[in-house]
């Protein structure tokens, strides 16, 4: 059965991008949080670097997700304490969703890195684009083209930001989602991924991540 969960917490409506975007080269997108992320071994996480059908921010979203999967403990130690600086809507003081995320990532074992997949990307792109045009929130495809191109076993949708690290942190925290579905998908046993970030008439931006 396909897993379909989505993040629709109203707070994302007002998210202001904080996390800066930069081209990678040899510098990790997480280098600002610890120089340890610049270790050459983490370059394998940039699996979408040479992909021509994704934007730079979409590639970066896959990159930071793979970094979190490859070394969840280091991500927990270096990035999560700064989560509120990246998104002001993440409460790092004494909030249950954040605390459970820290506990999970501190003890979990490394996961495989995700490879970009064109079918997942087409699925995500169609949904992000059509949802954005009509201000839709959810997983149901809006037209026959998107229904035919739907390709995922797990899907995460985020509304309000186009900044890769902010998107990832909001999905990982999964505030207001008791099932923690987004967190479980992002840290789940998938192999392939497609990402699309598009304008949204209601929330300014929407991001769709399709996993297979």
How would you label these PLM feature ranges?
Residues 6-7, 98, 150, 165:
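Alpha-helix initiation and N-capping motif
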Residues 18-21, 44, 156:
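The N-terminal extracellular segments of secreted preproproteins, especially immediately downstream
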Residues 1-25:
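Bacterial Sec-dependent N-terminal signal peptides
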Residues 49-146, 183, 189-192:
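Short, well-ordered surface patches within globular domains
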Residues 41, 45-49, 104, 151, ...:
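General secondary-structure edge motif
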Residues 32-36, 40-41, 95-97, 103, ...:
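Short, flexible segments with low predicted structural confidence
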Residues 24-57:
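N-terminal low-complexity, Pro/Thr/Ser-rich intrinsically disordered segments
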Residues 122, 126-212:
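A well-ordered secondary-structure block
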